[in-house]
């Protein structure tokens, strides 16, 4: 995962890592993580800090070393990319840019993709995604449908 990062990104993350690694021993402890997060206005509990470390602590030693930190950052960046892609896809469907995908907009895009759908099929697609029942799909509903794929 970390091998998809550029040299610039890696040196940027090295800098960030050193900010976390207060004593310079090459590992981030829960205490160091807590200090940095509190300086950023967060107030994580000891358990939350432990969870965050466990999430990326590949060798199970209770701390995060630089390779583990890089994997975490690469994962977070991948998540951001897919969020950007979802926003872009939503904009494609949302022709009038009002923040909602209507049945007409959905039909238009599907037709352009070569999908000939009946009104019933389009209505069914809207109904499946339309959590709040307003007859159109907002961004959150769109994300739910796309992430379920």
Swiss-Prot record:
Which UniProt keywords are present, listed alphabetically? Acetylation, Calcium, Metal-binding, Methylation, Repeat
The residues that the entry says bind Ca(2+) 2 are 57, 59, 61, 63, 68
Positions with a binding annotation for Ca(2+) 3: 94, 96, 98, 105
Q: Which SMART domains does the UniProt record give?
A: EFh
Give the sites modified to N-acetylalanine. 2
Q: Which domain of life is it from?
A: Eukaryota
Q: Which residues form the EF-hand domain?
A: 8-43, 44-79, 81-116, 117-149
Name a GO molecular-function annotation: calcium ion binding
**Family annotation (PANTHER family):** CALMODULIN, MYOSIN LIGHT CHAIN 1, 3
Function field: Calmodulin mediates the control of a large number of enzymes, ion channels and other proteins by Ca(2+). Among the enzymes to be stimulated by the calmodulin-Ca(2+) complex are a number of protein kinases and phosphatases.
Any remaining note in the record?
This protein has four functional calcium-binding sites.
Family of this protein: Belongs to the calmodulin family.
User: What is the protein named?
Assistant: Calmodulin
Species whose genome carries this gene: Capsicum annuum (Capsicum pepper)
């Amino acid at each position: 995962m970390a091998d998809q990062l550029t040299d610039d990104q890696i040196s940027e993350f090295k800098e960030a890592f050193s900010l976390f690694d207060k004593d310079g021993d090459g590992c981030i402890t829960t205490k160091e993580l807590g200090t940095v997060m509190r300086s950023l206005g967060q107030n994580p509990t000891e358990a939350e800090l432990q969870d965050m470390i466990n999430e990326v602590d590949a060798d199970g030693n209770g701390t995060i070393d630089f390779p583990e930190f890089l994997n975490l950052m690469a994962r977070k960046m991948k998540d951001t990319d897919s969020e950007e892609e979802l926003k872009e896809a939503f904009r494609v469907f949302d022709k009038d840019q009002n923040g909602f995908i209507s049945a007409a907009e959905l039909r238009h895009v599907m037709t352009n993709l070569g999908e000939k759908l009946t009104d019933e099929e389009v209505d069914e697609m809207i109904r499946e995604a339309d959590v709040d029942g307003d007859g159109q799909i907002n961004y959150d509903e769109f994300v739910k449908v796309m992430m379920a794929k």
